[in-house]
């Protein structure tokens, strides 16, 4: 039986991870390990200065007092009896498109699976009301089944964004590149009840590159976007120019 590790960044009790677990349980044995609280925006952070504590829940899930990356690392290195065949992260409440991927704990959980040598997928639901987790779950299962039947290179992560629509209104799947956002909006300055100054990060910037071919464009037009991501951040096109610059300094 195929074995799949499921994690997320919204927390182990979030509706998205439940929908994903149930959908994948129809085709695989699933171990669900997620953070014990919402860790949105945690990116690839690891907990290095405190121990990781776990709680085995009545539904079989395992909660971890740690980050999404902690969850996947701990699950594969210690909690799994053997190894998973794949790591799937989500279903995130909110899109992870364009620059979002740099901050996303959902993408980071999948990335940790890839670091440890396993095929990995991140699934996110784009919208405001988050009414159609089941639509995302159906597409997640379809994509996972495709990967099991025809594996892709292990050095990539599939970043999947699903529009928050009824299943019959989703037009299909498009392979996309990452779009881009404008810089985030300003910091919100306020006070706590004791009158002390506090700050909130402003909302993300609006789309800057949402042209045809981007994840933003596909999802806005009713398609599921799939973007292959790599963890190699090297700007290969700049190596020669940089060497020429270094030679002159």
Curated annotation (Swiss-Prot):
Q: Which UniProt keywords apply?
A: Cytoplasm, Hydrolase, Metal-binding, Nucleotide-binding
Q: What is its EC number?
A: 3.1.3.5
Its top-level enzyme class, in one word, is hydrolase
User: Where does the protein end up?
Assistant: Cytoplasm
Principal localization reads cytoplasm
Cofactor binding notes: Binds 1 divalent metal cation per subunit.
* Catalytic activities: a ribonucleoside 5'-phosphate + H2O = a ribonucleoside + phosphate
Q: Where on the tree of life does the source sit, at the highest rank?
A: Bacteria
Query: Record's InterPro entries?
Result: SurE, SurE-like_Pase/nucleotidase, SurE-like_sf
Q: Report residues binding a divalent metal cation.
A: 9-10, 40, 92
A single Gene Ontology CC term:
cytoplasm
> What Gene Ontology molecular function terms does this protein carry?
3'-nucleotidase activity; 5'-nucleotidase activity; exopolyphosphatase activity; metal ion binding; nucleotide binding
Query: What cofactor does this one take?
Result: a divalent metal cation
Q: In which family does this protein belong, per the annotation? A: Belongs to the SurE nucleotidase family.
Its biological purpose is as follows: Nucleotidase that shows phosphatase activity on nucleoside 5'-monophosphates.
Name of the protein: 5'-nucleotidase SurE
Taxonomic path: Bacteria, Pseudomonadati, Pseudomonadota, Gammaproteobacteria, Alteromonadales
């Amino acid at each position: 039986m195929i074995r799949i590790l499921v994690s997320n960044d919204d927390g182990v009790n979030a509706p998205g991870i439940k929908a994903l677990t149930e959908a994948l349980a129809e085709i695989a044995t699933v171990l669900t390990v997620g953070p014990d609280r919402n860790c949105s925006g945690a990116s690839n952070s690891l907990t290095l200065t405190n121990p990781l504590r776990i709680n085995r829940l009545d539904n079989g899930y395992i909660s971890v007092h740690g980050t999404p990356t902690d969850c996947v690392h701990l699950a594969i290195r210690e909690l799994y009896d053997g190894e998973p065949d794949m790591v799937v992260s989500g279903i995130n409440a909110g899109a992870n498109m364009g620059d979002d991927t740099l901050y996303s704990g959902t993408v980071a959980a999948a990335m940790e699976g890839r670091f440890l040598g396993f095929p990995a997928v991140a699934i996110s639901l784009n919208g405001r009301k988050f009414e159609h987790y089941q639509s995302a779950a159906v597409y997640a299962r379809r994509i996972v089944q495709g990967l099991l039947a025809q594996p892709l290179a292990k050095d990539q992560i599939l970043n999947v964004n699903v529009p928050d629509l009824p299943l019959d209104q989703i037009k299909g799947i498009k392979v996309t590149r990452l779009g881009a956002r404008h810089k985030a909006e300003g910091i919100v300055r306020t006070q706590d009840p004791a009158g002390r100054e506090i700050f909130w990060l402003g909302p993300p910037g609006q789309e800057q590159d949402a042209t045809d071919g981007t994840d933003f464009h596909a999802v806005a037009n009713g398609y599921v976007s799939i973007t292959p991501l790599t963890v190699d951040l090297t700007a290969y096109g700049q190596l020669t120019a940089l060497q020429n610059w270094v030679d002159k300094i």
